[in-house]
Amino acid sequence: MFEGVIPAMVTPFKEDFSVDYEGIAKNLDYLEKHVNALVPAGTTGEAATLSYEEHIDVVRYVAETSKLPVIGGAGSNSTREAIWLAKEVEKAGAEAAMLVTPYYNKPNAEGLYQHYKAVASEVSIPIIVYNVPSRTGINTTPELVRRLAEIDNIFGIKEASGNLKQISEIIRTTPDDFVLLSGDDFLTLPILCLGGKGVISVAANVAPHLMKEMYEAFVEGNIERAREMHHRLTPLFDVLFIDTNPIPVKKALQLMGLAAGKPRLPLVELSEEKTQKVKEVLKSLELIS
């Protein structure tokens, strides 16, 4: 259920910065036939600046509108808050919850283990750990992941450390049914080669059909085609991180006529200079004329 190409969805906003639910529906129409599941209300969905009510409403809307499996963002640096969010995401109709490692307070490995264990004990839906040290200031090590994999409803990890040795070690030392998903578009193909099962993707918001083509080529054993697609998509992977995510991907969606709106403060719109670079890449992929 949770393999393949899974977009980390943007949350489109209206001019007054309220959530644009019609925009979400429009983006779902663009995504659904190309992707395997959906992640609303994560980092790319600007969860950090959504109210609790908005957060849950976005997850609920996606779960009710789409026929695809939904992994709802539910992380917090407070264990009590993460438990509450995970319960609410479950009630909203998500098939799984994704929990970023607690940030800022920097717990040690035992604290991280107890955090995830506590959340897992309070919900019945599967949980995916989200490791992104560049944002949280803390790394989920292979040793810790091995322990977490023993908890019944922790089914996998979104790995965005960028450390292929660590990723390889996680795959090597966890059970075969433990799912590792790339959290870095550029590393999707290398991680698939190591035994990863897919990607939670920013680029899939923009080019879901091309991400699907790369993934399916790999699964079908056409490694040469998968490699060609990786190289073709690399400029997109790069330009979508020319500024803080999701600033560039929102600009790309605007240029393509999809729903995005401006990011909420403290994030600001992409500069004109960087916007031109986004345009060039979109044109090269025939996503805009």
Curated annotation (Swiss-Prot):
The record's NCBIfam families line, in alphabetical order, gives: dapA (TIGR00674)
**Similarity remark:** Belongs to the DapA family.
What does UniProt list as catalytic? Y130 (proton donor/acceptor), K158 (schiff-base intermediate with substrate)
What subcellular locations does the record give? Cytoplasm
Q: Which residues bind pyruvate?
A: T44, I200
InterPro entries (UniProt xref): Aldolase_TIM, DapA, DapA-like, Schiff_base-form_aldolases_AS, Schiff_base-form_aldolases_CS
Q: Which GO terms describe its molecular function?
A: 2-dehydro-3-deoxy-phosphogluconate aldolase activity; 4-hydroxy-tetrahydrodipicolinate synthase activity
Site (Part of a proton relay during catalysis) location in chain: T43, Y104
GO BP:
diaminopimelate biosynthetic process; lysine biosynthetic process via diaminopimelate
Going by the UniProt record, its keywords in alphabetical order are: Amino-acid biosynthesis, Cytoplasm, Diaminopimelate biosynthesis, Lyase, Lysine biosynthesis, Schiff base
Q: How does it assemble?
A: Homotetramer; dimer of dimers.
Q: Which domain of life is it from?
A: Archaea
* Cellular-component GO terms for this entry: cytosol
For this protein, the Enzyme Commission number is 4.3.3.7
* Record field: catalytic activity: L-aspartate 4-semialdehyde + pyruvate = (2S,4S)-4-hydroxy-2,3,4,5-tetrahydrodipicolinate + H2O + H(+)
What is its biological role?
Catalyzes the condensation of (S)-aspartate-beta-semialdehyde [(S)-ASA] and pyruvate to 4-hydroxy-tetrahydrodipicolinate (HTPA).
**What organism is this sequence from?**
Archaeoglobus fulgidus (strain ATCC 49558 / DSM 4304 / JCM 9628 / NBRC 100126 / VC-16)
Name assigned to this protein: 4-hydroxy-tetrahydrodipicolinate synthase
Q: In which pathway does it act?
A: Amino-acid biosynthesis; L-lysine biosynthesis via DAP pathway; (S)-tetrahydrodipicolinate from L-aspartate: step 3/4
Question: What gene, per UniProt, encodes this protein?
Answer: dapA
